[in-house]
Amino acid sequence: MQILVVDDETDVCTLFQQRFRKELRAQKLNFAFASSGKEALHYLHSHTTEAITVLSDINMPGMSGLELLRHIREEFETSPPDVIMITAYGDTENYNQALSLGASDFLTKPLNFNLLRQKLQLES
């Protein structure tokens, strides 16, 4: 399974690699990381033959996660990736906006990694 994590915080990469060490070792998961929405779109356009799940932070400088989601839904209409939005703000406005733009799911920080494993359909 290919996962693209989009977050402007550099320590997120290390956190995901630590929390999913078992799955990475068993080659059940492969992570790619993008530090901006623009970088994420470039990655998605260059990996169109792969099934990718995107985990994107909402609050990022430049292109927000919601703007990224809008671009993904417009640019990948025929085979859009699943997009799970992640935010430190658990308000209903972000939740409703993400779902109305086509998000597959929504998680709040700090992340519950067992819940994320369930959403990614991985064993706990």
Predicted features and spans:
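Receiver (REC) domain active-site loop signature in two-component systems and cognate sites
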Residues: 60
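C-terminal output helix
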Residues: 93, 111-120
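Active-site beta3 strand of CheY-like receiver
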Residues: 48-55
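Hydrophobic/aromatic residues positioned on beta-strands within the core alpha/beta folds
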Residues: 84-86
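Two-component/phosphorelay signaling modules centered on CheY-like receiver
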Residues: 10-32
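Alpha4 helix (beta4-alpha4-beta5 surface) of REC/receiver domains from two-component response regulators
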Residues: 67, 79-80, 90-105
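Short amphipathic alpha-helix used as the core "switch/output" element in two-component signaling
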Residues: 42, 66-79
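Helix N-cap/capping motif at the beta->alpha junctions
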Residues: 33-42, 65
